[in-house]
């Protein structure tokens, strides 16, 4: 299997979520299923079916997290420098609107655009890889091409 690049923070967050699921949520849902079973006929027991559905989701998420953690290749951005690569925090200026944006390039498993965590496989990240401060990049989006100037690169 292919390794999944991940920052130390991303791995820590995944381990935290896994611990929460295994030590708190899984036991709680097992208890809820047992209580719902006590209510009798399972064929029309909405509480039971709801709890089983939630259990299925929790077990699926646990498997997903365990898989990602086992394939994690932790890359500490603090040890990197130079042109943009995985782990870089990049300050950009939208050439059209002059709006400033800051993104950290991370792996798929920890990407969250709302938090400024940009998936390394995204079109913008792919355009930024290998570039340096002062360079401009153009990214094709569903709304048309967008240009960005790279103002600052840091590895924190």
Curated annotation (Swiss-Prot):
Keyword Cell cycle listed: no
Pfam families: GreA_GreB (PF01272), GreA_GreB_N (PF03449)
Coiled coil (residue ranges): 45-66
Keywords: Coiled coil, DNA-binding, Transcription, Transcription regulation
Membrane spanning stretches: none
Keyword Repeat included in the entry's annotation: no
GO annotation terms (biological process): DNA-templated transcription elongation; regulation of DNA-templated transcription elongation
One function term, GO molecular function aspect: RNA polymerase binding
InterPro entries in the record: GreA/GreB_C_sf, TF_GreA/GreB_CS, Tscrpt_elong_fac_GreA, Tscrpt_elong_fac_GreA/B, Tscrpt_elong_fac_GreA/B_C, Tscrpt_elong_fac_GreA/B_fam, Tscrpt_elong_fac_GreA/B_N, Tscrpt_elong_fac_GreA/B_N_sf
Described purpose of this protein according to its UniProt entry: Necessary for efficient RNA polymerase transcription elongation past template-encoded arresting sites. The arresting sites in DNA have the property of trapping a certain fraction of elongating RNA polymerases that pass through, resulting in locked ternary complexes. Cleavage of the nascent transcript by cleavage factors such as GreA or GreB allows the resumption of elongation from the new 3'terminus. GreA releases sequences of 2 to 3 nucleotides.
Record-stated family: Belongs to the GreA/GreB family.
Protein known as: Transcription elongation factor GreA
Originating organism: Jannaschia sp. (strain CCS1)
